[in-house]
Amino acid sequence: MVFYGQPRNEDGSISFSAEGTNSVFTVDLSRLKPDVQKVAFTVTCDGSHTVSSLNHLSIQIESGNTSLISGQVELSGRQEAALILGEVYRRNGDWKFVFIAQGFNGGLKPLAEYYGVNVADEPAPVTPPPAPPAPPKVSLSKVSLTKEKPAISLAKKANFGEIRINLNWHRGSGSGGLLGGMFGSNKAIDLDLGAFVELADGYKSVVQALGNAFGNYHSEPYVQMQGDDRTGEALDGEWLHINGREWKEIRQVLIYAFIYQGVPSWDKTDGVVTLHVPEQPPIESRLTEGDNKRTLCAIARLVNENGSIRVERINQYFRGQEEMDRAFGWGFRWSRGSK
């Protein structure tokens, strides 16, 4: 761990410095040990403060004096006391960067435990009052849905809060590495996020940028697209929000991604969908085993099971929304649309 109290790691490949409100981490990727697969950049707030009390928060990647990429965190209404701003990670021999901007309401302790670091609790008072039984400890490790573990259930709650679903991918074929693999191609793939939504009363709708069917968060169908990344330049990809306060009104949500523009090449997109539910570990499903003759992937399904959320991995590929509709029996009527 490298921070203001320990400004260098043991081999000097990562160092920290700060001036005013600016903090700088210098990372020498060539000196990192071979077993280092990921470097995470985080921020925590002191006391009872949350990140929404900050005036500005962003992360910028530089090489020399050249700014390569940057991402700004939307702070309004955020309740987290600790955030993962982004990660530099090793994949297929290259170093890549992903902007995350997700975190934990509990601050440093759950953040540290997420990365496997134990943080001691505050010392108890000398004469503490009797405490109620502690709730079962929730594991904050990321959950990956796979063939071997295709589903997970989240315990029933009256209010799940704002459920956020993120689609992120590599836009172009480039030359590999941190720049080439992520940002260096003019032949970017426009990968779009979408959802089929069925409410408890049987009402069904499609939420996607295609056809400007962006949905609605506060009223039916309680699912809404957060814009459309047509340029491929947004570091955090595309987002779909589900109103967890109204989960009782939702029967199921089918999450999918489709290639609106570009030649299908699922293995090169390295696509991943991540589900973020407040106070729950992130749940991710990767777009693997892609069929390059098909432009749409049915990724996962969220099912209301007596008030709980069951997340099921699907990972099936189709030629389009209409073919997927027939496969799962939704019964929509389709016509050609555009963005």
Swiss-Prot record:
Database matches in InterPro entries: Stress/Tellurium_Resist, Tellurite_resistance_TerA, TerD
Please indicate if the UniProt record lists Cell membrane as a keyword.
Answer: no
One of the GO BP terms on file = response to tellurium ion
Which CDD domains does this entry report, sorted A to Z?
Answer: TerD_like (cd06974)
Q: Where are the transmembrane segments?
A: none
Keyword list, A-Z: Plasmid, Tellurium resistance
Entry coiled-coil feature ranges: none
Role description: Not yet known.
Q: What is this protein called?
A: Tellurium resistance protein TerA
Q: Which classification does the entry list for the species?
A: Bacteria, Pseudomonadati, Pseudomonadota, Betaproteobacteria, Burkholderiales
